[in-house]
């Protein structure tokens, strides 16, 4: 039988994921802000689907204090209806 894990808070390091659909307010703010609920997250993976097509262009994702921000780039613009799939860890 395996022993217990002590000294490691492994549950708080489990990835959290979700799907966010951009709204008109995100469009006018030039960014979508997603509260992931994981304040200690240090990394993120983001996939954006716009009009049924995966956007691989220059969206600008950033992560601070559990809030994932996807901002406009030089060619990508956050648009109401964009589907943002995300994982933070």
Regions found by a protein language model. Give the residues of each.
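Extracellular receptor-binding modules and their adjoining Ser/Thr/Gly/Asp/Asn-rich linkers
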Residues: 1-33, 38, 75-89
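Short, hydrophobic/aromatic-rich segments at coil-to-beta transitions
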Residues: 15-19, 42-44, 64-67
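A generic structural signal for beta-strand entry/edge sites
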Residues: 29-31, 65-69
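Extracellular/luminal ectodomains and secreted, surface-exposed scaffolds of diverse proteins
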Residues: 50-67
């Amino acid at each position: 039988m395996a022993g217990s894990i002590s000294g490691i808070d492994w549950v708080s390091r489990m990835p959290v994921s979700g799907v966010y659909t951009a709204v008109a307010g995100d469009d006018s703010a030039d960014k979508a802000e997603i509260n992931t609920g994981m304040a200690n997250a240090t990394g993120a993976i983001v996939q954006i689907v716009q009009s049924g097509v995966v956007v691989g262009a220059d969206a600008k994702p950033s992560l601070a204090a559990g809030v994932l921000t996807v901002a406009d780039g030089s060619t990508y613009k956050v648009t109401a209806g964009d589907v943002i799939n995300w994982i933070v860890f």
